[in-house]
């Protein structure tokens, strides 16, 4: 038999053995459940123990809810997402949706084990769903090759639990805002049935974290925004005149030489996924590094700097995904008390974990339900307000659009996401708040890419 036929022969043999096992054990027809398949889960759900929830009553209903009803959304099908999907599918979750806007790159294959070389270039969500649907009997994984912003509140409301394996703080903040917008209040009291729990995991090298967020009840992403480190940027003066690191050379080529030379035609943007673009940046970076006797510029480093790649270690992904999947299981079954509410993991020097309770901020712009108070002089310019919204550690907005109600009409003071409106409202940035007609106690509505909700600010003059 040819070597190419050997894997197919093994696959058929495995299917035959599985069919024989189901027949011997008393298989359940076309349901895909053979006797003993869920014994490992039943041990947690059909008997009590010292760590079970005080209100938990062992029964078969929890397992049936897991198998037949519970619907989970996984956001991200990368290194963490692959581990999450595998863990959830093997834990009994059968109604799984996965969202990912990326396609598979060769560099993903060393740790994102649901993908194979033949899958390079295909959407991660679709390939991950195909793999699990084929490998795990009766598991139904529905892929969405989209951005999370492509879906409305009706889509997110259908899920019992949402778990994230993202590498983007903006995306985290957006889904956090979406889940908060789903909350219902009656006479100021939160309706618990409107809560969609969010389990969030993140990794960087040998470090990671996992957290449980119950929107409206526990600290949300915005409550602890200061915990996220700012993106590493190098001073332009250093990049241009005094480079000392390989990264300085790469950033110089990316930020200055590429726009100036436009090597692939006028207006062609740099694409971090295009090997030709990366190769050009790599060669030019080597040339600049040689001028300053700097060593260490490699193709891989070039790609990492251009794409802002976060270093990934497979074992860290496995640990954090296991924590997240365990929390999903605990919340879905109510068998155990969930994490309260933030866990950090460090595997740099030995093994270290620490759990603490992140506290809600009374004036959180996302979950407090209160307008945010800001103080400025009447002579302050609108540009100063814009700078505050983008530079404040507790806000960190990216492209805020500011509107206000003036003389009974809703007026856009500044909006930069639409070119024509940005040009029309740009002169407002140099005007004072008094010149714009704003008064003490004025409410400003601010929209931003970091949240699907409009954030209200109350302006107080000093």
Curated annotation (Swiss-Prot):
Site annotation Determines specificity for NEDD8: residues: 211
GO CC, alphabetical: nucleus; protein-containing complex
Pathway the protein takes part in: Protein modification; protein neddylation
UniProt feature coiled coil, ranges: none
EC number in record: 6.2.1.64
Entry keyword annotation includes Phosphoprotein: no
Annotated positions of the N-acetylalanine modification: 2
Region (Interaction with NAE1) residue spans: 242-248, 292-295
GO molecular function: ATP binding; identical protein binding; NEDD8 activating enzyme activity; protein heterodimerization activity
Gene Ontology biological process terms, A to Z: endomitotic cell cycle; mitotic cell cycle; protein neddylation; regulation of cell cycle
Signal peptide stretch: none
Keyword Heme carried by entry: no
Keywords assigned: Acetylation, ATP-binding, Cell cycle, Ligase, Nucleotide-binding, Ubl conjugation pathway
Highest taxon listed in the record's lineage: Eukaryota
Region (Interaction with NEDD8), start-end ranges: 227-229, 352-357
Residue numbers spanned by region Interaction with UBE2M core domain: 368-462
Regulation: Binding of TP53BP2 to the regulatory subunit NAE1 decreases activity.
Family annotation (InterPro entries): E2-binding, ThiF/MoeB/HesA, ThiF_NAD_FAD-bd, Ub_act_enz_dom_a_sf, Uba3_N, Ubiquitin-activating_enz, UBQ-activ_enz_E1_Cys_AS
Sequence segments annotated as region (Interaction with UBE2M N-terminus): 53-70, 157-161, 192-217, 331-338
Active site positions: 237
PROSITE patterns for the chain: UBIQUITIN_ACTIVAT_2
Function, as annotated: Catalytic subunit of the dimeric UBA3-NAE1 E1 enzyme. E1 activates NEDD8 by first adenylating its C-terminal glycine residue with ATP, thereafter linking this residue to the side chain of the catalytic cysteine, yielding a NEDD8-UBA3 thioester and free AMP. E1 finally transfers NEDD8 to the catalytic cysteine of UBE2M. Down-regulates steroid receptor activity. Necessary for cell cycle progression.
Note: Arg-211 acts as a selectivity gate, preventing misactivation of ubiquitin by this NEDD8-specific E1 complex.
Annotated disorder: Defects in Uba3 are a cause of embryonic lethality. Mouse embryos deficient in Uba3 die at the preimplantation stage.
Name of protein: NEDD8-activating enzyme E1 catalytic subunit
Protein's organism: Mus musculus (Mouse)
Gene: Uba3
